[in-house]
Amino acid sequence: MLKACGVAERGGQTEFANTYAAWEALPEEEKAELEGLRVRHSIVASMRPFAEIPTEEERARWIKAVFNTRLGEEVPPDCDPDDFEKEHPLVWTHQSGRKSLVLGVSADRVVGMPLAEGRALISRLMEWTVQPDFTYRHDWKEGDIVLFDNPGALHRVLPYRGGSGRVMHRTTVSGVELIA
């Protein structure tokens, strides 16, 4: 859930992509090929737009940022950035039986597939998922609240000027619907 406590004068909208709808619109043959694939997700992959091959210093800085902003604690001295790598199914099934694609900027590679081929597949599926048929753009007004199903959605902010007053509060509801 996101709540707008302050909004930017220009920009700062949030785009949501429906990964359930993206999955459902794929051809049946492609769905059959994708079922059972697993994807490695990592913080390094999520930072790749800023540094294709990060230095050890950059990796350490990213890990520190995760600990400080998400966990509110110091990085343990024995922390390895690779500890922040997780494997998830490419196709996740909700307890209702509905399926969605598990994608995002952290999706790094497809397990058991050559690196370039797996990254090309991830890139193609991302492009498919964020097409207009599956997306919604929210133009924030102060006080707006948007509730979304995180395993069934991708979301991103559009550019806005720093210091614009944009302040968002995020609330995460936990439960049994984990992606594993």
Task: Label every model-predicted segment.
Residues M1-I145, P151-A180:
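Non-heme Fe(II) oxygenase catalytic core, chiefly the N-lobe of the double-stranded beta-helix
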